[in-house]
């Protein structure tokens, strides 16, 4: 799968929050207030990257899903009403939750864009769609 094929598959999905763009073989999707998603796919090499566009810009986290999972992973990030929650700790950063805002398991979360809250020995970082 190429990034162009990934882009074509994503834009056909229903209920997208917004439409991603394709620039120099990189899919760019501005979903969040202070961060955006970059995705790349070529001959089995896949990357999804959450990039901060705040003062200290750079990659917040990236992962390498299987090629057959790329469309579903991106769709979960970009489906209208979904949010991403990352858990940061001394050991690294990982995905804590991707899904509908109303189904997020911690009811006492701080509803901030790119908000942070201490939780269980780490820090949760919230990305809600703008």
Task: Put a short name on every predicted segment.
Residues 23, 44, 90-92:
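A short, compositionally biased
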Residues 34-69, 108-130:
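Intrinsically disordered, low-complexity regulatory segments enriched in Ser/Thr/Pro
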């Amino acid at each position: 799968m190429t990034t162009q094929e990934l882009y074509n598959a994503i834009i056909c999905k229903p209920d997208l929050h917004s439409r991603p763009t394709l620039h120099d073989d990189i899919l760019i999707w501005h979903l969040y207030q202070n961060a955006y998603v970059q995705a790349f796919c070529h001959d089995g090499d896949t990357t999804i990257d959450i990039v901060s566009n705040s003062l200290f810009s750079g990659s917040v986290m990236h992962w390498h899903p299987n090629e057959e999972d790329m469309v579903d992973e991106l769709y979960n990030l970009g489906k209208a009403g979904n949010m991403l929650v990352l858990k940061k700790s001394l050991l690294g950063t990982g995905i804590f939750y991707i899904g509908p805002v109303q189904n997020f398991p911690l009811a006492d979360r701080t509803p901030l864009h790119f908000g942070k809250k201490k939780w269980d020995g780490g820090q949760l970082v919230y990305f809600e769609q703008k």
